[in-house]
Design a protein with these regions (language model features):
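Alpha-helical structural motif
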Residues: 97, 115, 178-179
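Active-site-adjacent "gating/activation" loops or surface patches in catalytic cores
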Residues: 102-137
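Catalytic or ion-translocation cores adjacent to nucleophile or general acid/base/metal-coordination motifs
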Residues: 132-180
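Conserved beta-strand termini and adjacent loop/short-helix elements that scaffold enzyme active sites
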Residues: 13-17, 122, 172-174
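A general secondary-structure signal for short beta-strands and their flanking turns/coil
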Residues: 7, 114, 162-164
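N-terminal extension/subdomain marker
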Residues: 1-111
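A short acidic, often aromatic-flanked loop/helix-cap motif at beta-alpha or helix-coil junctions
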Residues: 17-24, 127-128, 176-178
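Active-site ExK catalytic segment of metal-dependent nucleases
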Residues: 1, 120, 168-172
């Protein structure tokens, strides 16, 4: 590469791929939701549901602490299995936008909701908050299909430094492959 493209800044990485890894890649590609656990989501008492005949969604906000815990207790390959792009990291040369997300979270967490576009997640199902606990949404399975940069940046902040930020999120249930 260096002799044919001397001006190009190209880095080549190699990984050993065996049957287990190939099978894992196949499973991730054939099912967009690869994280099958169930989670309780603190919604701070806010949210609403939208339904059509083909899908339903619950729109709410999650705390940065909840998102931080989700990222750090799951496998990114599974968490982002339905997303064509994984978390890209942050730094001056890597990704200035993610660096900006991190700085906003640290400097002005209470305004983060206004700065951030939010997250879209596919789930197998959810149970809306009821009168016994208006602050909890129960979800089954999850893959983040939009918001990997926000999720990864929040997850990369050191424990105890996440702050009181809230992040917009949509939890969508849809089995129609022409829509998802």
């Amino acid at each position: 590469l260096e002799s044919n493209f001397p001006q190009a800044d190209v880095q080549v990485e190699a990984i050993e791929v065996g049957n287990n890894r190939i099978e894992s890649w196949f499973n991730l590609s054939s099912n967009p939701i690869s994280l099958n656990e169930e989670f309780d989501v603190d919604t701070n008492g806010h949210g609403f549901e939208i339904q059509t005949k083909n899908w339903k969604a619950y729109v709410t906000a999650v705390s940065a602490r909840w998102l931080h815990k989700l990222y750090n207790t799951t496998t990114p390959d599974l968490l982002f299995s339905g997303n064509p792009r994984d978390y890209l990291g942050y730094g001056k040369k890597k990704n200035k936008i993610n660096l900006g997300i991190r700085d906003s979270l640290k400097s002005d967490p209470t305004s983060f909701w206004a700065y951030n576009n939010g997250i879209t997640a596919l789930v197998y199902d959810y149970a809306t908050p009821d009168n016994t606990d208006v602050n909890k949404l129960h979800i089954k399975g999850i893959t983040i299909i939009n918001g990997a940069q926000t999720t990864g940046t929040v997850g990369s902040i050191k424990d105890g430094q996440v702050g009181d930020a809230w992040i917009p999120i949509r939890f969508i249930v849809c089995t129609d492959s022409t829509i998802i």
